[in-house]
Amino acid sequence: MLNIYLKSKIHMATITRKEVYYEGSIEIDEELMGKAGISEGELVLVVNVNNAERFVTYVIKGKRGSREINLYGAAARLGEEGDRVIIMAFTFSDKPVKAKTIVLNEKNEIVQEK
């Protein structure tokens, strides 16, 4: 039987920009995506720590090394610049999966990898 498991998490990312009238959803620095094991176009669950909003969207690959986490389109209405978010990706598996997690500081620099 297949279950859904957490496979990747970017913990405590800071929203750096938002733009409502834009095609897309969440843009993540390509370097951070790689470290967390998240791919462009992948479905993610985003939890806003500041306002408790939760939303599902897809990932846009951002500029490598920019440290940007940007909300676009309707998702931009669910967070503000400076809000801290948790970004999670999941997978189907018939056995438990060990999630890859990166923890960020307020400048979106990696402070811990698990």
UniProtKB/Swiss-Prot annotation:
Residues recorded with modification Pyruvic acid (Ser): S25
Modified how: Is synthesized initially as an inactive proenzyme, which is activated by self-cleavage at a specific serine bond to produce a beta-subunit with a hydroxyl group at its C-terminus and an alpha-subunit with a pyruvoyl group at its N-terminus.
Pathway involvement of the protein, from the record: Cofactor biosynthesis; (R)-pantothenate biosynthesis; beta-alanine from L-aspartate: step 1/1
Keywords, comma-separated and alphabetical: Autocatalytic cleavage, Cytoplasm, Decarboxylase, Lyase, Pantothenate biosynthesis, Pyruvate, Schiff base, Zymogen
GO cellular component assignments: cytosol
InterPro entries: Asp_de-COase-like_dom_sf (IPR009010), Asp_decarbox (IPR003190)
Keyword presence, Electron transport: no
TM helices/strands, residue ranges: none
Cytoplasm recorded as keyword: yes
EC number: 4.1.1.11
One MF term in the entry's GO annotations: aspartate 1-decarboxylase activity
Cofactor (UniProt): pyruvate
Catalytic activity: L-aspartate + H(+) = beta-alanine + CO2
Annotated active site: S25, Y58
Cofactor note: Binds 1 pyruvoyl group covalently per subunit.
Subcellular location: Cytoplasm
Subunit structure: Heterooctamer of four alpha and four beta subunits.
Known role: Catalyzes the pyruvoyl-dependent decarboxylation of aspartate to produce beta-alanine.
Family note: Belongs to the PanD family.
Entry protein name: Aspartate 1-decarboxylase
Species of origin: Thermotoga maritima (strain ATCC 43589 / DSM 3109 / JCM 10099 / NBRC 100826 / MSB8)
